[in-house]
From Swiss-Prot:
The chain crosses the membrane at residues 39-59, 69-89, 107-127, 160-180, 189-209, 223-243, 257-277, 283-303, 307-327. Residues 11-31 are annotated as: Disordered. GO terms for cellular component: membrane. Keywords: Membrane, Repeat, Transmembrane, Transmembrane helix. This is Solute carrier family 35 member G3. It is a multi-pass membrane protein. It comes from Rattus norvegicus (Rat). It is found in: Membrane. InterPro entries: EamA_dom. The keyword Hydrolase does not apply. Its main location: membrane. Belongs to the SLC35G solute transporter family. It holds the Pfam family EamA. The gene is Slc35g3.
Length: 340
């Protein structure tokens, strides 16, 4: 039945129509061509998740270059934008920490997301923003596909696998030449560490998406968004004073970057969390590769950092793969038929 499909929540058209309903109207009612729920989720991930998140990495790097802003301080500022969501939960009468039976998983989701963001912010400070985003998104896509196959036995169509392979290939084209020219000594060590942090950030992101898909309760999205801010503050504030040195920005550019990072990251968090409930997590991560293209454009036009021909070629492959993934999910919802 369509109602039991793991990715779609289609209306129940199995009930017999009234005798007075003309057959032509019934046929039109049961044969609706348009984007499926998965396609809608992918569009939300593309427009709200990928494009907005593409600005986060370059803006974070700008704040670091301008005021030497520590990564944990930027994470703290971002978490502050999540705390007002508690007002929504209070207004609806829902518990701030979620129902007791899923509270542990909700906190685990928040911890994984904080770890992912912390690794990402640290990575963009030592490697080019576009490359850091590339490694993080590539690892999240591959890990999401493997986790979905191992934990949920979810099948992907041939077009989906083609899109996943193409998007991952595009990321390899972008970051491959840079990995082959790492410098020896301290500089090369820090650069390699940045790529490792970016990979761990992608792994934590994929795990967090899988945990979120297992949460089913009212106000799930605002609850996990608030918990992200709460856990992020609890972890980051002590870590800032122990591991890093707090910096109070004195210029308008740094404050503008911090506000932009907080707002755009919140929008991306909400859109990605919504999208992963509608579509396969690996496909969502693949569509989020649009963040790489945006980051590369800002890296060249705003940060004035070099963009190699391989970056442009890889970005084109990524965009083509996103088009394949999105197009293969555009379908006609018909009575008694469900996409595989």
């Amino acid at each position: 039945m369509a109602a039991s499909h793991p990715y779609f929540n289609l209306p129940d058209f199995t009930q017999p129509s009234p005798p007075s309903t003309p057959s032509s109207l019934t046929s039109n009612h049961h044969n609706r061509c348009g984007p499926s729920n998965a396609t809608k989720g992918l569009f939300v991930a593309l427009l709200g998740g990928g494009l907005s998140a593409g600005f986060v990495g370059p803006f974070s790097r700008m704040a670091y270059q301008t005021s030497q802003l520590p990564s944990l301080e930027l994470l703290i500022f971002r978490c502050l934008f999540h705390l007002p969501i508690a007002l929504i939960l209070k207004f609806r009468g829902d518990p701030l920490l979620g129902p007791p039976d899923v509270r542990v998983r909700a906190f685990l989701h928040a911890i994984l997301n904080v770890l992912s963001i912390g690794c990402a912010y640290s990575a963009v400070q030592v490697v080019p923003a576009g490359n850091a985003v590339t490694v993080r998104k590539g690892s999240s896509t591959v890990c999401s596909a493997l986790l979905a196959l191992c934990l949920e036995s979810q099948r992907l169509s041939g077009y989906a696998w083609c899109g996943l392979f193409g998007s991952t290939l595009g990321l390899i084209i972008i970051v491959g030449p840079g990995l082959g020219t790492l410098q020896e000594g301290t500089t090369g060590l820090y650069t390699a560490l940045g790529y490792v942090l970016a990979f761990l950030g992608g792994l934590a992101l994929s795990l967090g998406l899988q945990v979120y898909r297992s949460l089913h309760f009212p106000s799930c999205l605002p609850t996990v968004a608030f918990l992200f801010g709460l856990v992020g503050l609890i972890v980051s504030v002590p870590g800032l004073f122990v591991l890093q040195t707090p910096v109070l920005p004195q210029d308008t550019l740094s404050w503008s970057c911090m506000v932009a990072v907080g707002l755009l990251a919140l929008v991306s968090f909400v859109c990605v969390s919504y999208a992963v409930t509608k579509a396969h997590p690996a496909l969502v991560c693949a569509v989020l590769h649009s963040e790489v293209v945006v980051a590369l454009m800002l890296q060249y036009y705003v940060l004035y950092e070099t963009v190699a021909p391989s970056d442009i070629m890889g970005a084109g492959v990524v965009l083509g793969s996103i088009a394949i993934i999105t197009a293969q999910n555009f379908s006609c919802d018909k009575e008694g038929q469900v996409e595989e």
